[in-house]
Amino acid sequence: MQRGKISFGKIKLNVNVPPAEPRSNETEAEDAKESTEASGNGGGFKKMDKEQMIRQIEDVAEDLESQHLKEVMGISGFGRKAAKVFDINEQIEKARVTRPGMDKKREESKPKEDDQKDEEEEDVIGPLPPAVTTDKEKATKESSKDEDSDDDDYSSDEDSDDEQSLAKRIPYTHEVQMQHGSRAVLALAGDPSGARLVSGSIDYDMCFWDFAGMDSSMRSFRQLQPCENHPIRSLQYSVTGDMILVISGNAQAKVLDRDGFEKLECCKGDQYISDMSRTKGHVAQLTSGCWHPFNREQFLTAALDGTLRIWQGLKSKEQLQVIKTRAQGGLRTNAASCNFNRDATLIAAGCVDGSIQTWDTRKMFVNTTHCVRDAHQKGSEITSIVFSYMGQQLATRSNDETMKLWDLRQFKQPLHTWTNLFSRYDTTDCCFSPDDRLLVTGESLPKGQAEANLYFYSTKSYEEVQRIPVSNAHVVKTLWHPKLNQLFVSCGNGTIKCYYDEHRSIRGAKLCVVKTHRKRQPMEMVGVSQIITPHALPLFRQEKSRTSRKRMEKARMDPVKSQRPDLPITSGQGGRVASSGGTLSSYVIRNLGLSKRVDDDQDPREAILKYAKDAAENPYWIAPAYKQTQPKAIFSEKLPADEPATKKPKTEADK
């Protein structure tokens, strides 16, 4: 039984012939005539009219043109897609041969490249040979036995392998030294992007280091004293890296921008108010401070007034919250260090009495969330308190020569305590490695020791992984930058050392080492001799060519050329003062004393004799006054030469 093909899109079932329509007798006769003509021609060509020939030629031309256009444009056709044509007989035969589920087995048993060939040649594929499965099972059994037998060996060697891998992770193959000054560097901070570094010392100076702009000489591009005569205790970049928090020995913290210009200075509290929560700021020396982990306008400060204060905003300059630290008896104790955890849900403070106190930022700061009273020796400052990057561990460094590691889930006892870590400065700190597998701290130089060391401890096995000798001075600050993978260590002699790995570290100090320092060429000293040219003399000097506007301005300034009129008569300075003056004293002085001045070069005798004849003829001052009493002038007699100029006056006794 032969079935016709089904075409989808326009579904037609044996519709090659259109449906029968009622025909007239005339149409039937014409069809019969055409069939007889076709049979008579023996299957030859039909006779076409001229119009039919032209239509077919145009159709063929259009088909060729459209096919060429499809090839150029890279498309399959215009308009609707052609309907696919399926053969029903072929589909039925395939359905009989293939059973449900056989295709999946074929795909699993053979690769995809041979599936097409196998489906055409073979209909059924048998199961895989059993030898393959038995080999796999044997291999898996043997491997499992080997793993079980080697478990003990691996467990014994795990610690040594971890220590070796941790030692390789420390970037200290190369070393670069930067000179800050001659005094101890107490503060060290790095930009979050790793482009810059800032340092502060006990000699009040703060230096800015730019790795992209420095050469092998490693000189800072800016040095300033932001807090005048106060040592810099702590520095920290904000989360965005555009501001720097400066904690000094003053009671007021400062915020600087990246270039060192002051943006904010905190308020100072009233020291005569006993309740510290009612003051607007700290009233004693600052000890520590840090930025909020993700809020760029919020930071935390701690001081010796027994409070921690949270500051919000750069414009308001007002504190947001006040946290009081309490000792065991309820008395006030001072916080020596403070810090936020990574998600800013906890604030931790290391106090002078050796206690560790934490507060939840989502609650009121009345009671502590965690409080460990005997965390360190009483009376020794906790110089550093640092959260791990994961936020589950806490490390503290104290002046009691110990460093402790704590777990926040079990906060009563420390996980481990490292001893014999001498620290002389109250800013000595510790830090975690970027993967939280190492804990790093430095020591001050003890007596009888040549060099101070930098220690690396494992946070899992608590063993010493590496010890690096730094210098013959105290090690104060340590900074392990997570992006640069470089270690920065500040020392007590004013130097900052940078350790990096040639392969594991990126940018930072590696950019400066490759740049050679260009020395300035010494300038030759040439004796300066005076050269006089004719054009320099006033006689031969020519005026410079100027524009008409400048010439007019200069002429306007000249009172002669501009024909300035006389200034008004005033008694003040700058005007044409009246000849008689504005007051009686000025009138007397000008008319009687200074109106007729006597020159120093003139002979006074000649000046007087000039008026002698006039005075004798027309006496006005002296002659009329003595005319009645002494009409004849009496002059002094000439004394003999032997007599002294002054004689002793005669008395009545002598007479």
UniProtKB/Swiss-Prot annotation:
Pfam families: WD40 (PF00400). The keyword Lipid metabolism does not apply. GO terms for cellular component: nucleus; site of double-strand break. InterPro entries: WD40/YVTN_repeat-like_dom_sf, WD40_repeat_CS, WD40_repeat_dom_sf, WD40_rpt, WD_repeat_GAD-1. Residues 147-164 have a biased composition (Acidic residues). It comes from the Eukaryota. Gene3D superfamilies: YVTN repeat-like/Quinoprotein amine dehydrogenase. The keyword Repeat applies. Residues 23-36, 91-115, 134-146, 554-564, 639-655 have a biased composition (Basic and acidic residues). WD repeats lie at residues 180-219, 227-268, 281-321, 330-369, 377-416, 422-467, 470-510. Residues 1-54, 83-165, 544-580, 633-655 are annotated as: Disordered. Keywords: Repeat, WD repeat. PANTHER family: GASTRULATION DEFECTIVE PROTEIN 1-RELATED, WD REPEAT-CONTAINING PROTEIN 70. Belongs to the WD repeat GAD-1 family. This is Gastrulation defective protein 1 homolog.
